Regions:
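N-terminal intrinsically disordered/low-complexity leader segments
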Residues: 1-6
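Amphipathic alpha-helical packing segments from all-alpha helical-bundle domains
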Residues: 66, 92-101, 107-140
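Short alpha-helical scaffolding segments that buttress acidic/His motifs in well-ordered protein cores
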Residues: 86-90, 99-103, 142-149
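An amphipathic alpha-helix signature
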Residues: 12, 84, 121-125, 129, ...
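Hydrophobic alpha-helical connector segments
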Residues: 56, 67-98
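Hydrophobic/aromatic residues within well-ordered alpha-helical segments
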Residues: 57, 61, 65, 79, ...
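Helix-turn-helix
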Residues: 8-10, 14, 18-52, 56
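Hydrophobic/aromatic-rich alpha-helical bundle segments in the mid-to-C-terminal region
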Residues: 110-114, 129-173
Length: 173
C-alpha cells in the first residue's frame, strides 16, 4: 500500500494518466487505487463518488487547457511563430484526444471541450487576422486539422503537416 498520503491532486493526476492510457473505464476507484498502490478508502476520502472524480478530472483538464491559451497569448513572437508554436503544442498534447473520445459519451466532457475549443478558435482567429486571413472559417479549419492530423498514420509528422498549411497561408497573402 501507499507509504505516503495521497492528495486529491495526485488522484486527479492519476485519473488523467489512466484516461490517456486506458480510456474512461479506468476512471474508477478500484483501478486507480490499484495503480496508485492505495486503498479505495483513500479514494473516498477525497471524492464522494466516481462521478465526483470525473468532474474533478474534467475541471482540472479544462483549467490547464485554458491556462495554456492564456500563456500563448502572453508569449512573445510574431503571429507566424505563435501559430506554429500553438500547432506544435496542440499535436503534442496527449490529453486532448482522450477527452475528445470521452466527450462522445459524456455531456459534461463535451461541454468542457466545447468551451476550450471556443477559446482556441478565438485565439486562432486573432492570430490569423494578424496574418491577413480574415475568414473565421479558416480558424475552424486549422483547429480541425490539428485535431485530425495526429490520427493519420502517414509519413509526414503532424507538426510538419500543420507547418505546411501555415506556409500555404503565408504564400497566399
Amino acid at each position: 500500500m501507499a507509504t505516503q498520503r495521497l492528495t486529491r491532486q495526485k488522484w486527479i493526476d492519476a485519473g488523467l494518466d489512466a484516461l490517456i492510457l486506458k480510456g474512461p473505464p479506468a476512471l474508477a476507484a478500484e483501478p486507480l487505487a490499484r495503480d496508485l498502490g492505495a486503498t479505495k478508502g483513500s479514494f473516498y476520502w477525497h471524492f464522494k463518488d466516481v462521478p465526483a472524480l470525473h468532474e474533478a478530472v474534467v475541471k482540472d483538464w479544462q483549467s490547464r487547457a485554458l491556462s495554456q491559451i492564456a500563456e500563448a497569448l502572453a508569449k512573445e513572437g510574431n503571429s507566424e511563430k505563435r501559430l506554429r508554436r500553438f500547432g506544435a503544442q496542440f499535436v503534442a498534447d496527449k490529453q486532448d484526444p482522450a477527452f475528445r473520445a470521452w466527450a462522445h459519451t459524456s455531456p459534461m466532457v463535451a461541454d468542457a471541450l466545447s468551451d476550450v475549443d471556443q477559446e482556441r478558435l478565438t485565439y486562432l482567429v486573432n492570430l490569423l487576422n494578424h496574418l491577413g486571413v480574415r475568414n473565421p472559417a479558416f480558424a475552424q479549419s486549422c483547429l480541425g486539422a490539428l485535431i485530425g492530423l495526429p490520427q493519420l498514420q502517414g509519413q509526414t509528422k503532424p507538426t510538419q503537416a500543420f507547418d505546411t498549411m501555415v506556409d500555404l497561408v503565408l504564400a497566399l497573402k
